[in-house]
Curated annotation (Swiss-Prot):
<dbReference type="GO" id="GO:0006754">
    <property type="term" value="P:ATP biosynthetic process"/>
</dbReference>
<dbReference type="GO" id="GO:0005524">
    <property type="term" value="F:ATP binding"/>
</dbReference>
<dbReference type="InterPro" id="IPR027417">
    <property type="entry name" value="P-loop_NTPase"/>
</dbReference>
<dbReference type="InterPro" id="IPR020003">
    <property type="entry name" value="ATPase_a/bsu_AS"/>
</dbReference>
<keyword id="KW-0813">Transport</keyword>
<comment type="function">
    <text>Mitochondrial membrane ATP synthase (F(1)F(0) ATP synthase or Complex V) produces ATP from ADP in the presence of a proton gradient across the membrane which is generated by electron transport complexes of the respiratory chain. F-type ATPases consist of two structural domains, F(1) - containing the extramembraneous catalytic core, and F(0) - containing the membrane proton channel, linked together by a central stalk and a peripheral stalk. During catalysis, ATP synthesis in the catalytic domain of F(1) is coupled via a rotary mechanism of the central stalk subunits to proton translocation.</text>
</comment>
<dbReference type="GO" id="GO:0005743">
    <property type="term" value="C:mitochondrial inner membrane"/>
</dbReference>
<keyword id="KW-0067">ATP-binding</keyword>
<comment type="similarity">
    <text>Belongs to the ATPase alpha/beta chains family.</text>
</comment>
<feature type="binding site">
    <location>
        <begin position="44"/>
        <end position="51"/>
    </location>
    <ligand>
        <name>ATP</name>
    </ligand>
</feature>
<keyword id="KW-0472">Membrane</keyword>
<dbReference type="GO" id="GO:0045259">
    <property type="term" value="C:proton-transporting ATP synthase complex"/>
</dbReference>
<keyword id="KW-0496">Mitochondrion</keyword>
<keyword id="KW-0375">Hydrogen ion transport</keyword>
<keyword id="KW-0066">ATP synthesis</keyword>
<comment type="subunit">
    <text>F-type ATPases have 2 components, CF(1) - the catalytic core - and CF(0) - the membrane proton channel. CF(1) has five subunits: alpha(3), beta(3), gamma(1), delta(1), epsilon(1). CF(0) has three main subunits: a, b and c.</text>
</comment>
<keyword id="KW-0139">CF(1)</keyword>
Length: 114
């Protein structure tokens, strides 16, 4: 229903950067990278329906972390954000503290931090 509302108000075609240069990158909703590795090419772009991106929307009465989480290519955005240096200066905070999780991500981040 959300895409129907957006489509009724604005006629927009979404383009998503695709290719090896986007793997492991943090990309905002407009397709621009927000990590510290700089710009990437669009590789011709692709329609959202042709990519393997899943957007999950939550209700407004849920916590912000639950609403904003989505999975892209099998990687949790919150885990990727936890690896980025100086992310709090950009005003972006991970939905889950990766150092509190009991996983391989926790071990990797603790080694990276020290």
């Amino acid at each position: 229903k959300v895409h129907q509302v957006i489509g009724a108000v604005v006629d927009v075609k979404f383009r998503v950067p695709v290719g090896a240069g986007t793997l492991g990158r943090i990309i905002n909703v407009t397709g621009d990278p927000i990590d510290e590795r700089g710009k990437i090419g669009l590789f011709g772009g692709a329609g959202v329906g042709k990519t393997k991106v899943a957007l999950v929307f939550g209700q407004m009465n849920e916590p912000p972390g639950a609403r904003a989480r989505f999975t892209q290519a099998g990687s949790e955005v919150s885990a990727l954000l936890g690896r980025m240096r100086g992310i709090s200066e950009l005003g972006i905070y991970p939905a889950v503290d990766p150092l509190d999780s009991k996983s391989r991500v926790q071990q990797m981040l603790q080694e990276y931090k020290s």
